[in-house]
Amino acid sequence: MRHRKSGRQLNRNSSHRKAMFSNMASSLVRHEIIKTTLPKAKELRRVVEPLITLAKTDSVANRRLAFARTRDNEVVAKLFTELGPRFAQRAGGYTRILKCGFRAGDKAPMAYIELVDRPEVEADAE
């Protein structure tokens, strides 16, 4: 029985899921908006929101924790120099999920996941 087990399996084993969400979190931090399936977007929130909360207080220990979860120095630098200060006054809710229809091949529900308070000068990338 799977009573009270949280998180989606997404038809992947645990190491694949961990690597996928690490890569997706890095992409979201780098581009600030990505397009993915709705279940993956909802699950990605659980990875990205704690990373941004971690980035609100800049310390060596927090930078190492963020690096352990993303494995990308460029992403860690952006988290602590841009995103941490940007969301310093916000107590959670750093991401927004916008549904955008269904994928052509298999009718999977698709969604954009983006960081709120995103600068408007960037063009939206798909």
Curated annotation (Swiss-Prot):
GO BP, sorted A to Z: translation
Protein's UniProt keywords contain Chloroplast: no
PROSITE patterns reported for this sequence: RIBOSOMAL_L17
Alphabetic keyword roster: Ribonucleoprotein, Ribosomal protein
Pfam family, one: Ribosomal_L17
Any single Gene Ontology cellular-component annotation: cytosolic large ribosomal subunit
Gene3D superfamilies for the chain: Ribosomal protein L17
PANTHER family linked: LARGE RIBOSOMAL SUBUNIT PROTEIN BL17M, RIBOSOMAL PROTEIN L17
Subunit-level organization: Part of the 50S ribosomal subunit. Contacts protein L32.
Name of the molecule in the record: Large ribosomal subunit protein bL17
